[in-house]
Amino acid sequence: MKARHKRLGLIVAGLAALGLGAALVLSAFQKNLVFFFTPSQVAAGEAPRNRSFRVGGMVEVGSIERQADGVTVSFLVTDTAQRLRVNYRGSLPDLFKEGKGVVAQGKLTADQLFVADEVLAKHDENYMPPEAAYALKQAGAPALAGALK
């Protein structure tokens, strides 16, 4: 009977350790999960205010403003329905251009300014992330989204 209780205790302890490990993994996964939003979704209030997320769309033509310090850049990201001002301090990718696709990761300030800590540019003229193409299509720009797939 004593050996049976030991085995039962080991099984319960093993299951508890397994459950704790799974909870820790899920917690770490959720903290590192980054969601993707369009400027229209941000304007509608769907984006989180207190955590990092990605915003994607096209860099609006004529919107790039470089600051005197040479590393701070401000530009507008649009999904053709709404636009969002993005500030970024750092080196932009070589393929970053007006009228091209972009995905920026960062946080939204109280005054609807997106402060990016990472900017990713579309890597070739025939590619657009599926999320961005779908978002552009949902925003009412099916011709543009189809042309950029």
UniProtKB/Swiss-Prot annotation:
Domain of life, per lineage: Bacteria
Ranges that cross the membrane: 8-28
Gene Ontology molecular function: heme binding; metal ion binding
SUPFAM superfamilies, alphabetized: Heme chaperone CcmE
Topological domain ranges for the Cytoplasmic compartment: 1-7
Membrane-topology annotation of the record: Single-pass type II membrane protein
BP-aspect Gene Ontology terms: cytochrome complex assembly
UniProt xrefs under Gene3D superfamilies: Nucleic acid-binding proteins
Side Periplasmic, residues: 29-149
Positions contributing to heme binding: H123, Y127
Keywords: Cell inner membrane, Cell membrane, Cytochrome c-type biogenesis, Heme, Iron, Membrane, Metal-binding, Signal-anchor, Transmembrane, Transmembrane helix
Record's subcellular location: Cell inner membrane
GO cellular component, one term: plasma membrane
Keyword hit for Heme: yes
InterPro entries in UniProt: CcmE, CcmE-like_sf, NA-bd_OB-fold
Family classification: Belongs to the CcmE/CycJ family.
Function: Heme chaperone required for the biogenesis of c-type cytochromes. Transiently binds heme delivered by CcmC and transfers the heme to apo-cytochromes in a process facilitated by CcmF and CcmH.
Protein name: Cytochrome c-type biogenesis protein CcmE
Organism: Polaromonas naphthalenivorans (strain CJ2)
Higher taxonomy: Bacteria, Pseudomonadati, Pseudomonadota, Betaproteobacteria, Burkholderiales
Gene name of the encoded protein: ccmE
